[in-house]
A protein has these predicted regions:
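Short, intrinsically disordered, low-complexity terminal segments
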Residues: 1-7, 19
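N-terminal, polar/charged subdomain of small-to-medium soluble alpha/beta proteins
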Residues: 34-137, 143-145, 149-167
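Serine residues within intrinsically disordered or low-complexity segments
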Residues: 19-21, 26-28, 36, 43
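A generic local structural motif
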Residues: 5, 28, 125-127
């Protein structure tokens, strides 16, 4: 049985004033974040994410910038107002086979790194859930010393992502 909101807030406050386990405390603080963030792998040179929250396009662009790279290519796939012969589309709903999305993205990045060894930073982020008209559903970013490798790798990644990732 759930207490009234005011009583729950008071209980939560008291719980924080006594000794609480890290798990108990993190659940109350991180609950909304865990609900919106499904899966992320992020390192110095790879950022893969499946998220129910809006994608951080500008953060991805800034992250991909490297002092040894003269090119950063960022592709954003947005929700448009038509799909095939359907017009008046206002939103899309994405579902994912979550356990397989990030491992598949890792494999695609490995393919790209073999084909274009000069690429440095690679990001592939995709939304789940409702994505409104004009919002980003997917972001791919690649940085490289030269634009030809960055463009080619980014095009390869988005094409393979759309064809093979279980979304």
């Amino acid at each position: 049985r759930r207490a009234a909101p005011q009583a729950w807030e008071a209980t939560r406050w008291r719980r924080r004033t006594r000794s609480v386990s890290p798990i108990e405390d993190s659940e109350s603080v991180l609950g909304p974040l865990i609900d919106s963030l499904i899966r992320v792998i992020r390192s110095d040179d790879t950022w893969l994410e499946l998220s129910g929250a809006p994608l951080p396009v500008e953060d991805v662009r800034r992250w991909a910038i490297r002092p040894d790279c003269g090119a950063v290519v960022v592709f954003c796939g947005t929700t448009r107002d038509h799909a095939g012969d359907r017009v008046g589309v206002t939103e899309l709903h994405y579902e994912a086979y979550e356990a397989h999305v990030v491992p598949r993205l890792e494999a695609l990045v490995a393919e790209a790194r073999i084909a274009w060894p000069a690429i440095r930073a690679v990001a592939a982020l995709h939304r789940t859930g409702k994505v409104a008209l004009g919002e980003e559903a997917v972001v791919v970013a690649v940085s490289s010393a030269h634009r030809s490798e960055a463009f080619a790798a980014a095009a390869h990644l988005i094409d393979r992502l759309k064809a093979t990732v279980p979304l």
